[in-house]
């Protein structure tokens, strides 16, 4: 039996085989003055949207978002079929839980046994990998969650679609209090319906959601009240923490959840700029010129989270998914002091061997004259602490 067959659902009471979106009747009355609003997108501190040296978001004639760089090529149905039919799958994920436990152990996060330790102070920055693109980041007196994915499948149904081969290290009920969630785009492995419902059930309007342009209505229909929807280069903050700026920055990807909604929602990365630390979350992306713009504008970053998996075959995946060498180039472009690898070791979404991404990452680092501690790998549930005073990491 697969290890996830008996795993706890992230949803409050039952599985959600389909997206039956609902809106709470009291979503406005109980919002505490923080109900979602597109007016909240107005910049309060920084505004680079009108400058000539940054790439703005762009729509095609059909009103849908497009990638504005020559590094992009549209995903076509013939190419999808060629990939699915003609290319060999080398992922080789073992069916044995014992072998998976040996190769990709899932650790119990520190905050389960010691919840009082959650929340670093002042200069500290701690990152915990919870699988795929989900990180818990503690910085500048805030606790953040990126692209929360706690369900068994990355799919509109929990009965079919890509199934995770490593369980989440914790449940949503075991998380410490989360201040904000960063969503990069609306694909099912990054925007998980059950996880959104469960987080909203637990934290309600106290939890601020930062989402791309076009996603506000979907979030509201899920009952989320405290949602900030941003375009590229727009920014906002968490109430009571206005010294930390959240900027929605570009990436090269695409969006889709249904047959007819291609690219009606924007995609992107996040730059979190605090008085002590700067954190960059790349989300899901191919390599493009945007990262050099981000590095020049907001770098250096104390920590960047950059995807390294789901990259084969390159003729098809390179436009939408960075491979380990692309990831190192992104690390350099955004001027990251350290980076953590994400988007690997959880779902088999492409054709490379499931253990290959870290190997290829270390090879790329050596070619670029970098060390493994510059761009590091975490086990599921593992944390690292970055002290910006001496730049030393401590495992937790």
Swiss-Prot record:
Entry protein name: N-acyl-phosphatidylethanolamine-hydrolyzing phospholipase D
Effect of residue 190 to N: <1% of wild-type activity
First-level EC class: hydrolase
Subunit structure: Homodimer. Bile acids promote the assembly of inactive monomers into an active dimer and enable catalysis.
Regulation of protein activity: Activated by divalent cations. Activated by bile acids. Activated by membrane phospholipids such as phosphatidylethanolamines. Inhibited by cardiolipins.
Membership in a protein family: Belongs to the NAPE-PLD family.
Classification via InterPro entries: Metallo-B-lactamas, NAPE-PLD, RibonucZ/Hydroxyglut_hydro
UniProt source species: Rattus norvegicus (Rat)
GO BP terms: host-mediated regulation of intestinal microbiota composition; N-acylethanolamine metabolic process; N-acylphosphatidylethanolamine metabolic process; negative regulation of eating behavior; phospholipid catabolic process; phospholipid metabolic process; positive regulation of brown fat cell differentiation; positive regulation of inflammatory response
Membrane-topology descriptor: Peripheral membrane protein
Positions with a binding annotation for Zn(2+) 2: 189-190, 284, 343
Residues binding Zn(2+) 1, per UniProt: 185, 187, 253, 284
Biased composition (Polar residues): 1-12, 26-37
GO cellular component: cytoplasm; early endosome; early endosome membrane; Golgi apparatus; Golgi membrane; hippocampal mossy fiber to CA3 synapse; neuron projection; neuronal cell body
Cellular localization per UniProt: Golgi apparatus membrane; Early endosome membrane; Nucleus envelope; Nucleus, Nucleoplasm
Annotated keywords: Acetylation, Endosome, Golgi apparatus, Hydrolase, Lipid degradation, Lipid metabolism, Membrane, Metal-binding, Nucleus, Phospholipid degradation, Phospholipid metabolism, Zinc
Leader sequence segment: none
Region (Disordered) residue spans: 1-41
Bound cofactor: record note: Binds 2 zinc divalent cations per subunit.
UniProt-listed Enzyme Commission number(s): 3.1.4.54
Predominant subcellular localization, coarse grouping: Golgi
A GO MF term: phospholipase activity
Main function: D-type phospholipase that hydrolyzes N-acyl-phosphatidylethanolamines (NAPEs) to produce bioactive N-acylethanolamines/fatty acid ethanolamides (NAEs/FAEs) and phosphatidic acid. Cleaves the terminal phosphodiester bond of diacyl- and alkenylacyl-NAPEs, primarily playing a role in the generation of long-chain saturated and monounsaturated NAEs in the brain. May control NAPE homeostasis in dopaminergic neuron membranes and regulate neuron survival, partly through RAC1 activation.
Result of changing residue 170 to S: Small decrease in activity
Names of the cofactor(s): Zn(2+)
Consequence of substituting residue 343 to N: No effect on activity
Positions that bind deoxycholate: 256, 348
